[in-house]
Amino acid sequence: MRRSLAPSQLAKRKPEGRSCDDEDWQPGLVTPRKRKSSSETQIQECFLSPFRKPLSQLTNQPPCLDSSQHEAFIRSILSKPFKVPIPNYQGPLGSRALGLKRAGVRRALHDPLEKDALVLYEPPPLSAHDQLKLDKEKLPVHVVVDPILSKVLRPHQREGVKFLWECVTSRRIPGSHGCIMADEMGLGKTLQCITLMWTLLRQSPECKPEIDKAVVVSPSSLVKNWYNEVGKWLGGRIQPLAIDGGSKDEIDQKLEGFMNQRGARVSSPILIISYETFRLHVGVLQKGSVGLVICDEGHRLKNSENQTYQALDSLNTSRRVLISGTPIQNDLLEYFSLVHFVNSGILGTAHEFKKHFELPILKGRDAAASEADRQLGEERLRELTSIVNRCLIRRTSDILSKYLPVKIEQVVCCRLTPLQTELYKRFLRQAKPAEELLEGKMSVSSLSSITSLKKLCNHPALIYDKCVEEEDGFVGALDLFPPGYSSKALEPQLSGKMLVLDYILAVTRSRSSDKVVLVSNYTQTLDLFEKLCRARRYLYVRLDGTMSIKKRAKVVERFNSPSSPDFVFMLSSKAGGCGLNLIGANRLVMFDPDWNPANDEQAMARVWRDGQKKTCYIYRLLSAGTIEEKIFQRQSHKKALSSCVVDEEQDVERHFSLGELKELFILDEASLSDTHDRLHCRRCVNSRQIRPPPDGSDCTSDLAGWNHCTDKWGLRDEVLQAAWDAASTAITFVFHQRSHEEQRGLR
C-alpha cells in the first residue's frame, strides 16, 4: 500500500474543495506529501476506514453551522421544560435525586446511639453464629425517630409516639393495626401524629419506608392548621397536599394525582382533607390503597350508621389512628363504634358489646344499684379496660403542670333576676314541659322548651320576640317587662349572669392588661355580647360559623399579638371550639353549658395551652336552681363515666341517679346551688366549707374535691372577689379549684 494512503497520513491532509466534513470521503482527493514538523508529531494518530465517513473533523476549519439556526434550536430546547410522566401530576419535581444502590451493610436511617435518640424498634440480638447464617440483605435495622423531631418531644410525647408506632405496625395486638390517641387537650396529639407519619414514610425494620401515603381527615376549620403544623415541625422536608376549596373537578383531579403516586415518586405523600370533602369524593380515594389514615376529632365517628363513618371505613387501609380527647361523649355504644373503627372485632359485635359490657357497667354506675350489680359492673369494667388499653393511650392534662402556668377553674352560680324568675315560673305553668317528658325520652316540644329556658337564663331579651308573639309558655308575659323596654338596647341588670359578666369585664379592664374570651352556644348571645362591648367601648373580635376558614386564622393571629388593642374575643362553641389557640387571652368565660361535656371542655381549653405565660382563669356561669344546673349535673355524670372507662378512676363518686336527671323542669328559687345540694357534701355545714379539699385535688377531680364558697373570702381570683363585692346578690355559690400548685423558682 502506498504510504500516502496510510491512515496515519490521511488524517493529516487537507482535502481540496471541501466546505464541511459532512461530504463523502474520496480517496483521490489528496495533497502532496510534506515533511513532518515537530508540532505535527504530537498530533494523535487515528485510524479511518476508507469505506465510511470520518468520525472526527479532518480539517482545521470550523464546522459550517448557521448561527441563527443554532440559536433557534437551543431556544426550542429550553422552551420545553421537563414534564413528569405521571398522570395528573401537580406537585414539584421533589428533592429526591437519582443515585446508586446502597452498598454494604444495611443500617438505620438515624443513629440509635445518639444522645436522646428515640428508638421505636430494636432488632433482636444475634449471636455471631446466627449472623453468619442469616442473609445480610435481610437483617432488620433500628427504627429511630428523626432527631429534628425527637429533640422537641416531651417525655409523654415520646411515650405516645412509641405506642402509636407499635399499634399501627401490629406489634401490640397481632393482626390489628389501629389505635386511639385519647390524650386530653394541650398534650400535643398533633405533633405525635406528625412524628408517626414522618417515621412511617421514611423507614422500617426492613430498611425501606413502611408506607408511601398517609391521609389526615379533620374538621374543615383544622385543615389549614394541620398543613401549617406539618410545615412547622418538618421544615419543608415534605410537601403535604391540603384540600381546602375548589370545584368538584379540581378536587377530583388533585385526589387522582395523589392516589396515582407510587413508590419513591410520591412528591406529596400526605393528604389533608375535611370530613365533608372526604365523604363527597370518597369514590376517588377508594381506587387505590393508603398506608395510614388519621382521623382528627375522631369522636365524629361515634355513630357507625352515618355516612362519614361508612365512607372512612371503606378506605383501603388497615392502619387507622383516631384522635379524640373525649372518646366517651354520650354512651358506651358510641365508645364501641370508635374502637371498632380502628380495630374491627376486638370487642365483638355491637349487640355482643351492649349485652356483655354496656348494660352491666351502666347498671353498676347507677346510684341506686345493688351490691351485686356494682360488683358485676366493676368486673366488666376491668375486662373492658384490659382489652381497650392495648390500643388506646390516654394522658390527662395534669401533665401540663410541668410546662404551663397555673389554671384556676371557677363554677359561678348566679341568681335569676326577678324578671327572669317570673318568666321562668310562668313558662313552667303554661307550657307544662315536665308532663311531656315521659320515661326520659324527649319530644320535639320538650326540646324546644329546654332551648327557651336556656335562652331565658342567658337574658330575657332572647325570648322577648316569643313574648310579643305570645308563643306557648309566654302568653301575657310581655306585661312582666319594664315599661318602655326595647330589645335593641342591652340592659345587663335584667339577667343575673349578664350582670356578673359586666362586672368581671369592667374589673379586668380597669385592674389588669388581661384579655378575655367569651364563649356561648348561641349566636344570639354573641349579639348581646357585642351590644355590651359597644356600650362599654371595649374593642372586640367575633368568630362564629359565618366566618371563612382563612379569615379565622388572621383574626386569631391578630388577637394573640401583644400589640393588638382587642380586649374581648367572642367565640361560638359550635363553630370554633376545636383547635383554636387563643393564648393572647388568659381569662375565659363559658356563659352557658352544653349537654355534651366535650364541647365545653374543648372551648375552655383555648387559653390554657402551649405558649401561655400568664395565670389562667376559667369562669363557668350557671343560673342557680335552673335547668342549667341540671345540664351541668348531666355533664358530671358523663365525665364520671368517661373517667371510669378511659381514665380508670375507680373512686369517682356516684352522685346522680338516672331518675334525678329527669327532673329538668323544676325551679328551686331558694337553693344557692342545686349541684352542691345533691353532692351531700360532708366538708360543708350550712353550705359553708369547714374543711379544705383532700390533698392532691386539682381541676380534674370530682366537684366534691373542689373548694366550696358562699362568699368572696375563699376565692383566689381578685377579679371575681371584686365582682362579688359589686354584685353581692347576683352570685350565690362558687366551686373553684386550681390545676396545680405553682412551683416558684423552677419556671
From Swiss-Prot:
Induction: Expression increases approximately 3-fold in late G1 phase compared to other phases of the cell cycle. The modification N6-acetyllysine is found at residue 515. One of its GO terms (biological process) is double-strand break repair via synthesis-dependent strand annealing. It is an enzyme of class 3 (hydrolase). ATP binds at residues 183-190. This is DNA repair and recombination protein RAD54-like. A motif (DEGH box) lies at residues 296-299. Belongs to the SNF2/RAD54 helicase family. Plays an essential role in homologous recombination (HR) which is a major pathway for repairing DNA double-strand breaks (DSBs), single-stranded DNA (ssDNA) gaps, and stalled or collapsed replication forks. Acts as a molecular motor during the homology search and guides RAD51 ssDNA along a donor dsDNA thereby changing the homology search from the diffusion-based mechanism to a motor-guided mechanism. Also plays an essential role in RAD51-mediated synaptic complex formation which consists of three strands encased in a protein filament formed once homology is recognized. CDD domains: DEXHc_RAD54A (cd18067), SF2_C_SNF (cd18793). Residues 2-9 are annotated as: Required for chromatin remodeling, strand pairing activities and coupling of ATPase activity.
